[in-house]
Amino acid sequence: MKKIYIAGIGPGSPEDITPAVHQALREADVVVGYAYYFQFIQEYLHEGAECIDTGMRQERERARLAIERAEAGQTVCVISSGDAGIYGMAPLLYEMCDERGSDVELEVLPGISAFQKAAALLGAPIGHDLCIISLSDLMTPWAIIERRAIAAAEADFVTALYNPKSIKRYWQLERVRELFLKHRSPDTPVGLVQQAGRPDQRVWTTTLRELDTQDVDMFTVLIIGNSQSFLSKGKIVTPRGYYRDKGSDEEKVGQRIMSESFRTILSLLKHPESYPLDHLWAMLHAVHTTADFEMEELLYSDPNAVSRIYQGYVDGKIRTIVTDVTMV
């Protein structure tokens, strides 16, 4: 069978390898990967499976070997750490198969990425919009990396940093810290996870002000919080943004009061988890307006009615909304 599984094996812990990847490894006649990663998957291979390992920066060679073996009729599994589509082998294999006009079937099997593992260990730091930036300038010019870092800092994204430091790249992380301090509070939480999911794992938190880049190496993932992120019992929490205790400088006092009111109402509802999000949104407004929690039992909305009305308004298809409210 002319097939290549492109498998993300997770950050390193056996329990983070998905069942689908287990199955692909068992089926493979040939497994291709960076030599360091084979220690994490050896036990899942069938007897007689051929392992082809290469060193760092030999991605094209790995891809070529995998394609050639698959074209010869073997089932091949190419492994990447984390998720194969995030700084992994998936894009390269698609590119090279396209260049060759190869008829090999490619199937990408997702894996737990290092930033996801790090986030879980740090609490809940990626509860809102986020971006991932690699600080390695091996394939991307530093000028572009810096421009992206500035954009992320200005836009208040939670930001995960990969490849923050190496022997030759020792100043880039400090530069990114400087850029973020121009747009974020010095007290912004920063989480660091070293060797995520591996025996030498280390997890700690700090702030942008106190971040010591000397503690970081190439196996460290950093997660920088946004303006709403906070530390709680040693964990980083980034609220989803719907109900916030603190408003930004631009937020009006009335909006902050409403946000706090909604948080309180939500905590007092009997069954908040059982309502569709658009119905819950309308219910919060109804209770907030009337101060009557019986609205939880009285309010009715057609399925998806609120979201459809909202979308129609955003799209400009609905220009008039008629309301009939009787206040007693």
Predicted regions and their residues:
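Class I SAM-dependent methyltransferase SAM-binding "motif I" and its flanking Rossmann-like core
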Residues: 86-155
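General beta-strand structural signal in soluble alpha/beta enzymes
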Residues: 32-34, 53, 78-80, 106-111, ...
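Short, basic, glycine/proline-bearing loop/turn elements
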Residues: 1-9, 49-53, 129-135, 285-297
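Glycine-rich phosphate/diphosphate-binding loops that line cofactor/substrate pockets in enzymes
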Residues: 66-73, 150-155, 305-318
